[in-house]
């Protein structure tokens, strides 16, 4: 998992970086410089592919179709971030991936509604399986790492709406992948240094 992340960070750092542009406060303050926001968004997509690759490589699990799907019995289409099956347990895992759970007031209910809507669709699509759904926040190793009341409040808001938040360590346990908290945060710091180079 970590090796793939380092490889991808090196690849991204060698590509032409998007620069801050006139109209942004960063540009006004410091002029054109490498857009860290763009790098974070790009690496967020890499995280999604890293998790999917890990699931493909883990015996007993099967990656299911993700991406934009038409919801059963509706004209709506929604994007499914991560969907996989524990073959032995007949457990479907659906996760909306968020690298930043500090969502603004409007996005939190919309994200919660999306997860619940998709979970109903998936229950109809996979009636012979148990569904485990929620949000996966890969920027945090474990919920105990969150000390800010603001973050804890966001988690309570999601959970009170019926949507659980899981973290990197949760998916690592599910996939029997051994990565310590120290290794995980060291990995992210390495990625950050590479992307800023």
Where are the predicted features?
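Non-catalytic C-terminal interaction segments of nucleic acid-processing enzymes
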Residues: 1, 14, 151-197
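A short acidic/basic microdomain associated with nuclease active sites
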Residues: 53-76
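Conserved catalytic cores of phosphodiester-cleaving nucleases, focusing on short active-site segments
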Residues: 55, 80-101
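Catalytic cores of nucleic-acid endonucleases
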Residues: 97-158
């Amino acid at each position: 998992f970590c090796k793939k992340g380092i490889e991808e960070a090196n690849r991204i750092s060698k590509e032409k970086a998007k620069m801050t542009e006139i109209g942004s406060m960063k540009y006004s303050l410091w002029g054109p410089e490498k857009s860290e926001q763009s790098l974070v968004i790009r690496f967020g997509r890499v995280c999604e592919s890293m998790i999917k690759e890990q699931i493909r490589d883990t015996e007993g699990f099967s990656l299911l179709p993700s991406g934009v799907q038409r919801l059963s019995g509706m004209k709506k289409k929604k994007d499914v971030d991560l969907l996989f099956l524990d073959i032995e347990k007949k457990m479907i895992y659906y996760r909306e991936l968020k690298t930043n759970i500090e969502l603004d007031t409007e996005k939190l209910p919309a994200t919660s509604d999306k997860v619940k809507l998709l979970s109903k669709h998936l229950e109809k699509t996979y009636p012979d399986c148990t569904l485990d759904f929620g949000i996966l926040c890969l920027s945090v190793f474990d919920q105990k790492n969150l000390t800010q009341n603001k973050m804890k409040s966001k988690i309570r808001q999601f959970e009170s709406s019926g949507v659980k938040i899981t973290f990197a360590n949760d998916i690592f346990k599910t996939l029997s992948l051994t990565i310590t908290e120290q290794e995980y945060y060291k990995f992210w710091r390495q990625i950050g240094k590479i992307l800023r180079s």
